[in-house]
Structure formats: structure tokens, C-alpha cells
Amino acid sequence: MERIPSAQPPPTCLPKAPGLEPGDLPGMDFAHMYQVYKSRRGIKRSEDSKETYKLPHRLIEKKRRDRINECIAQLKDLLPEHLKLTTLGHLEKAVVLELTLKHVKALTNLIDQQQQKIIALQSGLQAGDLSGRNVEAGQEMFCSGFQTCAREVLQYLAKHENTRDLKSSQLVTHLHRVVSELLQGGTSRKPSDPAPKAMDFKEKPSSLAKGSEGPGKNCVPVIQRTFAHSSGEQSGSDTDTDSGYGGESEKSELRVEQPYFKSDHGRRFTMGERISAIKQESEEPPMKKSRMQLSDDEGPFTSTDLISSPFLGPHPHQPPFCLPFYLIPPSATAYLPMLEKCWYPTSVPVLYPGLNASAAALSSFMNPDKISAPLLMPQRLPSPLPSHPAIDSSALLQALKQIPPLNLETKD
């Protein structure tokens, strides 16, 4: 019979083969094959963790439900009473949540309205009218209302002359009546009426004061030139005008008064003629002239200075009295050019009006030593330019005698 080798035990004489270790086989690594095998201890631990997880999950769910119920109970307590009365019976959880949602929406709408009102107030608009009104429109409305109130007060006070008997209650009732008429749209009073006589009431005290004073009380006496007919008065008036008082402050007051003034003789003359008689001082200092300009103007005195100067200027209403050429004798015409340079700045001097001394004038031309003091021309202030030296009269006459006389024929 044949034996089955699997049923027979191995012979004991054969030695046991030693186990192979990884270090015995060089070049071969079996470390990656070790991970395939798992220990039974890890499997047992995972099963134990599942069993232990079920217990805390139940506790967590229980706690979560408890928190939900507690929050719903608090919402139920916080709901207003009018919302609780809308439902009958017990308030379920779903009903409490619905009422809470409704109440929150109402509060949100209210907050939105309040925000709009706050924005309107910050931008200067009225709470009821949020369309196109700006700050300027509000200011104009305030000013128009104030003007209307002031106009009514002034008109009411103007009707009652005796203000002592007037009471404040009467004025208040009058203003209330006017406001009611304006609100009703009465045609008798319109806010667009012309402004009242407010300015008239304000200007009445000042106008009355001016009227009581009269035109002459505001006038201050101004030092003016008085054209006298005698030499003594004329010499005394020269010192008055040189006092340095120019009357600058009175010019503005005189311009406010009447444009025409009456003189002592009843003649009317304008403001310009009256101011021309007042001494005026130029604001800018006079410009210095060179010698060439001085020779062109014929010495230190010019014809324009003599005409416009207050010393030799004629009366504004009387023509100047000039000495004609035919009154000068032929003998004087010979040395007349020298007299122009030495004594007289112009060939024809201007005399004061009303001077009844034609013969005296001729004698003064012939004899310069006998010229009276009032008829002498005033000298200007000393200028830096060199002036012509004065010549003695005796030396002048001797020099003139040596000059041959010119054959000049004059008219009758």
C-alpha cells in the first residue's frame, strides 16, 4: 500500500530549517508588506468607541432640545400682550415663532421710518415734506413770515396814536386774526403786498429833527474872502484867509444842504461858486520846475496863477478891471519890457474891482516907489530856484535915461 505523505508526520531525523531574517537576504526589503497586517487590538478599540459615542450623543441632543424650548419660552414671555390675545388657547412653538417674526418686522419698519426722519432733520428738511425743499427755501419762508408780522405790528401801532393805552393782549389778538385770515386765503391781506411803511417810521424821527433845525443851523461859519472896496479892508482880509483853516469838514455838510444859496444882495449862486471862494489846499505838493520851464512861464508868476489866485482873482460876479494900453504914456512904453522883468510878472496887471484910481495907477507905474502896500503883489514862498535880484529904483532910472527913446506913436 502506498502511504499518503500528508498523513504521516515528518521524520524526526531531519533537522529543522532555520528561519530567514531580512538581513540574511541582501537587496530585498519586505518592510512595505508589514502594513497589510493589522492587529486585533485596534479593531476592538474602534468598536468600543462606537458604543461609547452613542451615550454622549443622546445627552447632546437632549441638551439641544432643552435650549430650544427655553428660548421659545423666553420669546413667549417677551411678546407683547396684544399679539398674545390674537391666538386662542395654548401657544404652540410654531405660533410663538410666527408672532415673533411678525413683531420683528413691525419693529424694523418703525426703525426705518425713524431713520428717515433723522436724515430729514439733519438735511434741514421738514419731517412732513421730504420733496425738494432745501435750507434756502426754509430761510426765505422764515424771513417772509417775520416781515409780515413786523408789517402788521407797525400798521397796528400806526393806527393807534396813543400807545400808552395799548395793551399787549390787543396786539396778540390782532396778530392771531391776521394769521387766521392768511390761512383762510383771504384776499384782503396778501403776503406779497409791498413792504409797509417800516422805513418811514424809522426815518420819521431823523427827518423831524432835521426839519426843526432848519437849513442854517448845521452851517458853521467858514473863513471866506470878503471883497472890500477900500485898501484898508483889503489888507486886513488877507490875514484872515491865511490862517490855515480850509473848511474841509464844512464842505460835506454844505453839499447836503440846498444846492443854491442866496447872497446878501438876493442873488442866487451855485455851490461851486460858493466853494470857490473858500480857501482850498491841494493834497499833492507842487512840482518843482526847471529853469527852462520857468523861463517859458515868464518868471515865477504865471498868468494862470494870477487869475486863479485868491489875492488877485476878480469877484465871481463882477468883470475884472484891467488897465488898457492907451492909458500908458509913450515915455513909459520904452522901459515897459524892463519893468515886466523886474517889477511886474505880466504886461497888464489886474486891479481889484471898484478901485477908482486910474491916475493913481498911472503914477504907480511911473513911480514904483510910491506904490501903496495893498496894491503890491504878494510874493510866493521862497523856492529853491534862484530868483531875479531886485534892482534899486534910482539905478533903474539912471539906466533907463541912457536908453534912447523909441519913436512909438500911440492912439488918442
Curated annotation (Swiss-Prot):
Post-translational modification: Ubiquitinated; which may lead to proteasomal degradation.
PTM-bearing positions, type Phosphoserine: S235, S383
Domain Orange: 142-175
Any one Pfam family match given in the protein's UniProt record, by short name: HLH
Cross-link Glycyl lysine isopeptide (Lys-Gly) (interchain with G-Cter in SUMO1, SUMO2 and SUMO3) mapped to chain: K159, K279
Cross-referenced PROSITE patterns: BHLH, ORANGE
Region entry Disordered, spans: 1-21, 182-257, 279-298
Oligomeric form and interacting partners: Homodimer. Heterodimer with BHLHE41/DEC2. Interacts with TCF3/E47. Interacts with ubiquitin-conjugating enzyme UBE2I/UBC9. Interacts with HDAC1, SUMO1, RXRA and BMAL1.
Protein name: Class E basic helix-loop-helix protein 40
Native species: Ovis aries
Gene of this entry: BHLHE40
